[in-house]
Amino acid sequence: GGSSTPSPNPTPVQEVASCDVASQKRFVDDVIDDWYLWYGELADVNAADYDDPNSYLQALTAPLAVDGRDPGFSYLTTAAADEAALSSGAYIGFGFRYGFDTSNAFRFSDVLEGSPAGDADLRRGDKVLAIAIGGEFETIAELGARDATTLEVFGDSEVGVERGFRVERAGDVFEVTLLKRELATPPFAGQPLLLSRAGMDPIGYLHFRSFITDAEPLLVEMARTFRDANVTDLIIDLRYNGGGLLSVAEQLLNIFAGELGQGDDSYRISHNDKRTSENVAVSFEVPDVALSPRRMAFIVTEGTASASELVINAVSPYVETVLVGSDTFGKAVGQYAFDQRGCENRLRLVAFETLNGEGQGGYYTGLVDTGRFTLCPAADDITREFH
């Protein structure tokens, strides 16, 4: 996840006469030397050896990719594409995630509401038997035997790309045809739930997909629902949540621990030694609708990253916290957005590390590896519903 707003452009900023490859590589050099969190550990490479600025950037940051600190977190994009993704999670696709179960069967692991897959009533756990790429159906085994690529199987990210799916559910087999279209990822999978238990207040359950702007009003309604039901125990399902906006993470932290940590640092942002003046400590604030849970269980996988890990790390000093699933991805850093003036280019660059209010961070190989969290190991059984 990146910052809630683009950072200042690097100084000095010069208007560019052109947006050619050479100027883009110079832009990368100017920004990375000033802002990159580990600027002193960059590879010594020659810009002239690279045909495009992205490959040059990846060559520069290669030493940080090897040890897992920056495995592709820094990249070039366009301002329009970046803003669309962070505001609504917009992309072009069929609207499903997939995985393989313990018998290596291909199954849908998540189906987005309002997507082509959702409109076709496909569901998590449905088994895909075969896919029609342009003509006859080919079984998953046949596609694997001929080493069909993901791009070939699912097609380009273009509106109108069509694929057929032969699907099995509870012994019944049916076929659907899906056409890709532009989608906005729903922040929640379904609605927040109240899980009843005899003689006790209910448990609140939320499956949270992404820290995007569209989530903000939904999180307020979630908090109101749980507060009105006297919820003190929460299950927050972040198994596929790869992060997003810090502003949304702040909102969620304030809902969970704004009252408990009032006046304390919620989390801290630490930059390189050239940019220590940018370091900030963000304090907890009490929102209009707050929860003060006693216990929280976070469902996590290696797909749980960035803002998701920040929230878990920051709330843990205030609430009894347990992780359920497997270790998280390990994205303890954030990017800023740098725009090349006069061009469409935007550089998303790792520029800061996130720490909780007690100064704890460094979860580059996952939260569990820090030794500060209890993990209840559990497999993500994609044959079953989320809850």
Spans of model-derived segments:
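N-terminal Sec signal peptide cleavage junction
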Residues: 1-3
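Flexible, low-complexity junctional segments that flank or bridge functional domains
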Residues: 6-234, 248
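C-terminal "post-core" interaction segments
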Residues: 199-206, 213-233, 241-387
